[in-house]
Amino acid sequence: MNHIRNFSIIAHIDHGKSTLADRLIQRCGGLEERQMEAQVLDSMDIEKERGITIKAQTAALQYKARDGQVYNLNLIDTPGHVDFSYEVSRSLSACEGALLVVDASQGVEAQTVANCYTALDLGVEVLPVLNKMDLPQADPDNAKAEIEDVIGIDATDAIPCSAKTGMGIDEILELIVAKVPAPRGNPDAPLRAMIIDSWFDPYVGVVMLVRVVDGRLLKGERFKMMASGAAYNADNLGVFTPANEPRNALNAGEVGYIIAGIKELKAAKVGDTITLEKKLPNNLGPAEQALPGFKEIQPQVFAGLYPTEASEYDQLRDALEKLQLNDASLHFEPEVSQALGFGFRCGFLGLLHMEIVQERLEREFDQDLITTAPSVVYEVVKGDGEVIMVENPSKMPDQGRIQEIREPIVTVHLYMPQEYVGPVMTLANQKRGVQLNMAYHGRQVMLTYELPLGEIVLDFFDKLKSVSRGYASMDYEFKEYRASDVVKVDILLNGEKVDALSIIVHRSQSAYRGRAVAAKMREIISRQMFDVAIQAAIGANIIARETIKALRKNVLAKCYGGDITRKRKLLEKQKAGKKRMKQIGSVEVPQEAFLAILQVEE
């Protein structure tokens, strides 16, 4: 075990994490030259395109150090985005060390800070590395100062490197061998292994990536999950060098995969502990207690997904089920809307997660989707004291039956150059933010706010980028549910509620939002042969109204001169026809209308 080193790489998007991983793999001969491609560890197309890492991947590397010993280095790739923070914490808890990769030309960013704090909380040794030193605008001294200021770890011997040219790679490997502690764990205790990640493979079923903490697992042994108690046979074991390499046993301190013919990803939850099923003469039996830190992931943001053609409902369901095989944090359930027909209510970890799921549905499964405005989960206390969770605005009970509504509050860390503090604070205050803290680190400022999650999901991130010219970065974590004066605004077309257009907003903004949505609808819905009234209402109170005037045929065109009574007769006839039409006519709501809710602000 003394020759094993488990480490991961923490970096902000675009700071060169995947490229650095490629270099380390290449240096240790993990893949032959012909198998090397850019971003070896990012296996999904969308990961390579957006340059982000979503699922954890690993590589077991063999490195012959300068002291002549051969070390087994396990690189565990972590997702860098805040939506996937639970996956990050699981990846990090499987490591003893982490390389903090900072772009020497840009300095530290908010998400790096968030992941770095997670690592320090878990007791992981953090080693700073300055990447992109080949760029002419690299400023290593400033980057070091920022690391010390913001994160508070000593950066005097941070290693300068360039993943692109390969400079400094050997120094990084030596640093890992010297500074990262060997795995703590007891090879002679009962088996305990933590699931870092799991994904679905069409040939063998679920593949689990595990870090063995205590004991060992042999091929063919029966093991069980401690959270669910389900037991399976360890059919195949092995390690990734990124290509997979079968083994007969996984020992304490190692990171490897287990294939056990599991059909559903839900059975292999990330963060769960694996132990042996029962005591046999040749083993030590099951462990007493599970490894700490496991929690069920709760979706934070909900949206409705509907197929554009009603006949494609089944394909959409199949597509979602297939996605769920590889993404256990995606929740969905069938939902019916009067306006959009049959579809699904889906739960996501955050906005990036939602975008990625939508994009994968459209790209990998050829789905045409209508998406409703994202909403968050509210805790509603009804008149009789019963507490229900409402994640869909159209399911909100009537005002009269509600005692109070509690909305989710998150703690947000905003990180930006000091000249943008003013606009960012104005934005946070508009969104009902409460400032908790403000700290200067050199030229950078870190603001801490409490904000309602409902205000963030619509457009906060885009606005933040625009008021700070793209320099501000943010991350958020859930804090609590808090009572708040929020109301449901319904949109009515000719007196009929359109359920998919309902929104939940704070009372202080309800009139403004109602007017804005009504005005937007007026632009989008095409003119009919009769008047269309668009109204925004809270309960029975109408708070805004717009009217789309009817198109009129000129029925008087063929009367040249003539008596006024003749003209009046034709006009009355037209009026009667319009009135009848209005009673039976229905208004088509185009797809853009559902997206318009998101862009009301502009």
From Swiss-Prot:
It catalyses: GTP + H2O = GDP + phosphate + H(+). Transmembrane segments: none annotated. The keyword Hydrolase applies. Residues 2-184 form the tr-type G domain. GO terms for cellular component: plasma membrane. Keywords: Cell inner membrane, Cell membrane, GTP-binding, Hydrolase, Membrane, Nucleotide-binding, Protein biosynthesis. One of its GO terms (biological process) is positive regulation of translation. Its EC number is 3.6.5.n1. It is an enzyme of class 3 (hydrolase). HAMAP family: LepA (MF_00071). This is Elongation factor 4. It comes from Paracidovorax citrulli (strain AAC00-1). The lineage of its organism: Bacteria, Pseudomonadati, Pseudomonadota, Betaproteobacteria, Burkholderiales.
